[in-house]
Amino acid sequence: MHLSTHPTSYPTRYQEIAAKLEQELRQHYRCGDYLPAEQQLAARFEVNRHTLRRAIDQLVEKGWVQRRQGVGVLVLMRPFDYPLNAQARFSQNLLDQGSHPTSEKLLSVLRPASGHVADALGITEGENVIHLRTLRRVNGVALCLIDHYFADLTLWPTLQRFDSGSLHDFLREQTGIALRRSQTRISARRAQAKECQRLEIPNMSPLLCVRTLNHRDGESSPAEYSVSLTRADMIEFTMEH
């Protein structure tokens, strides 16, 4: 029997480095982290920068990392786990995983409710609702855009003061109102141009569209309806049965 000794039958040095780095990415890195500088990695593996770059190219092609001009190599893998239950809290959940979540307000207005917002909140189309839009980041990386809708206009003076951090924590601290998730619907679609700009992602990237109803304890009508556009590569939802 003839056994091929062609060089391509064996992993090249850059393929070996890529495999080693991929293993380390799985075990030690989180989405939003950066790899050590190119010079450090080349010295560690005792190769020239050209070989090291070919190894990084393989990780880029597989979607593990992304090159950021002038910044470094950004880790994209290992999506965060997010449990979908009545008590789920975005900020606390990510803090428990050793990450640094932040949230900033992009918009706060009173506007007439569209048909789907009115249906979700159980009100008449055209009635005014409070509309807040927030951008959430994890370790500095944009994760999701969220549109929040509230039917109770007495909350408007309070919600106007919200600027950053956890919206639900702010609402509880300012008003004593605690919200509980009562329904979640998840679908998928491609990101549109403005969404790509806000989320700092390539055109047509996959997004998870998460529609959520939140209730106050003891009340039948929803207090909040939210629509979250979340990067599909950065999060995994877990549902216990």
UniProtKB/Swiss-Prot annotation:
Xref: InterPro entries: Bact_HTH_transcr_reg (IPR050679), Chorismate_lyase_/UTRA_dom_sf (IPR028978), CP_lyase_PhnF (IPR012702), Tscrpt_reg_HTH_GntR (IPR000524), UTRA (IPR011663), WH-like_DNA-bd_sf (IPR036388), WH_DNA-bd_sf (IPR036390)
NCBIfam families on file: C_P_lyase_phnF (TIGR02325), PRK10079.1 (NF007486)
Record flagged with keyword DNA-binding: yes
Described purpose of this protein according to its UniProt entry: Belongs to an operon involved in alkylphosphonate uptake and C-P lyase. Exact function not known. By similarity could be a transcriptional regulator.
Protein name: Probable transcriptional regulator PhnF
Gene Ontology molecular function, alphabetical: DNA binding; DNA-binding transcription factor activity
Residue ranges: DNA binding: 38-57
GO annotation terms (biological process): organic phosphonate transport
SMART domains assigned to the protein according to its UniProt record, in alphabetical order: HTH_GNTR (SM00345), UTRA (SM00866)
Residues of the HTH gntR-type domain: 11-78
General remark: The sequence shown is that of strains K12 and B.
Keywords, comma-separated and alphabetical: Alkylphosphonate uptake, DNA-binding, Transcription, Transcription regulation
